[in-house]
Every structure is written in C-alpha cells, then in structure tokens.
Amino acid sequence: QDPRAGEVMVKIAASGVCHTDEVAQQQMIPVPLPAVLGHEGCGIVEKVGEGVTEFQKGDHVLFSFGYCGHCNSCLAGRPYACENFNAINFGGVMSDGTKRLSKDGQEISSFFGQSSFATYSVVHKNSIIKVDKDLDLDILGPLGCGIQTGAGAVLNRLKPTAGSSLVVFGCGTVGMSAIMAAHLCPCKNIIAVGGNEKSLALAKELGATHTNKRKKCDCIVGEIKKITGGGADYAIDTSGVPDFVKKALACVKFLGTAVVLGVTGELTIQVQEELMGEGKSLIGIVEGDSNPKLFIPQLISYYKEGKFPFDRLIRVFEFDEINEAFEASHSGNAIKALLKMR
C-alpha cells in the first residue's frame, strides 16, 4: 500500500542480514506470521505520505528501529527505551496498528517497522535517516542496527576514558563495531575473543591490541587479568552464549562493568560471589543506547574521516543468495553479509 500520514515509501537498495531476523523466523521473537523480515535496509525515497516534509522523492536514506516518539522515554531523547518498542518493532503492524503488506488478499506482517527484504518498503519517518548522495548507499543499512549496537554500547553508554581496558567476546558485526569504537576513545587494552583466525586478524587491524581464540577460552579470565593488571574495566558479550557472559563478568575488575548485547539463554549467576562481592555491574544495552537520527550521522562522519572503517566488515550477496548469506554469517565467512536488491 501507499504510505499513509507520517510514512515514506522507499525503493530498497540493499539490506544487511542479522541474527535477529533468524530469531524472528524461528519465533524466539513471536512476530506474527506470515511476515517479511529484514531490518538493516537502505534505499531511495519513492513517495512520501501526508505531513512528511523532511524527506522527498530521490533522497538517499537508511532505516533504524521504530519508536513512537511520544512516550516519556522518547520525549526524553531515549527512543531505544521506547515504551512501545516491542509492539512497533515486533508486533507485525505499523505504528498506527495497521498493515501495509499483503499477498493474494492475505495481510502480511512487517518487521522492525521496515521489512527490508523486499523491493519496496513503507517506513515511518521516525525510523529514517537521510544520508549524502556521495556515499555508497548500498553499504549503509547495517549502521541502523548491528553497527550502532556495538559502537553505541561503547560510545553512548560505557564512555571509556583514555587508558581504559575493554574485552569483546565475539568478533561479528556487533563485536567489531565495539572494537572500532573503543579504538576511537582510545582504550589502552582492547582484547578480542573470537571464533576464527581470520576474524581475529581483522579485529587486530581494526584496533584490538590483543586477541584470543575462543576454543582456548577456559584460561581467558586469567590471561585478561594478566594483560590488564587485575581485570578489565569493561567487558562486552555479543555472542549470547551463557558461558561467555559469565566469563565477561569474571574478567572485569573490582567495580567493573560487563555488558550483554546478544540474545542470551538461561543463565545462573551467584550474586554474592560473581557480582555484589566486588561491586561489579552486569547490564543489558538495547540498540547501543542510540538516538539514530543523531548517532548514525556521527558514525558516518567518523567513517568519512577514516576513523571507523565499517565497510571492511561487509560482504555483498545478491538477494537470491539470501540462504548463502546467512550460512556465510554462521560459518564466519562473512562478518556482515549484505543483500543487494538492485
């Protein structure tokens, strides 16, 4: 359907693939089916709905998560904590409670307010960020989710001072983005824990000062304490593997902070022994604590200055290679798989 008030129709240029798409497909996030997935999209504006003045036909744009814009969190500048976040992004409907997609008379659910695995998408203006036309549009979509999640966790929430130490478990898109952000701070010690030598080598090029193979993770806590002189200031788990979350908490020093960014299964923590006894913090961060309309342009500025080379994470696939793209993501043959739609 055409865009309604406050909405924009965009012809999709490309979309990143993300583990969250699979989580929704597998119904770990109960998005109503059938649905069109995809939530790291970018493209060119085709039409604008009533009341939309900030975008026009031909604009280059990328998408981020949806938010209502009128709850207490949104009004306080925290759209990542929108009180209607789950309904807007995972409820299968647009912000007005209706659907824009259908096939043979059957309504189809949307995802993350964008459903970017498609030729066209209708998106609320809240989720759209305009970008300069001199940028390579195709690579920008992942900024709207995975990249801002990792980078934002560091730059928006942790805000490490120069000389701090940070450990990142997982060298996928989120982890690599956190490493690049930590390098910007700059942290003294940036320790990457990853699954294969190729990704660890890239992590080193992007700013990691030390690397550790995940298969050798049993002794990682001791190694980190040796490198950092007693424990890291911060540790981020991007894998969602419960054992790595526990190791992230164990490797930070007294009053240190461990962060969970991945979808994590059941986990048992001994509060006195592992958390309270040393004044540690264990926190979850959603979408990098980001206000996308402000933070994504900041990341693009860093990229243009050569300080945030996120393009090195990307491997491009054609849309009909979508299954291969997900397989490459699983195997580590692609850090950020990107589907080209044009």
Locations of the language-model features?
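Glycine-centered, small-residue-biased loops immediately flanking beta-strands
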Residues: 256-257, 280
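Adenosine-nucleotide cofactor-binding segment
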Residues: 162-171, 183-247
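Glycine-rich beta-strand-centered segment in the early N-terminal region that forms part
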Residues: 2-15, 28-75, 80, 129-134
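NAD(P)H dinucleotide-binding glycine-rich loop of Rossmann-like/cofactor-binding domains
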Residues: 72-169
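C-terminal hydrophobic helical "lid"/dimerization subdomain
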Residues: 246-250, 293-342
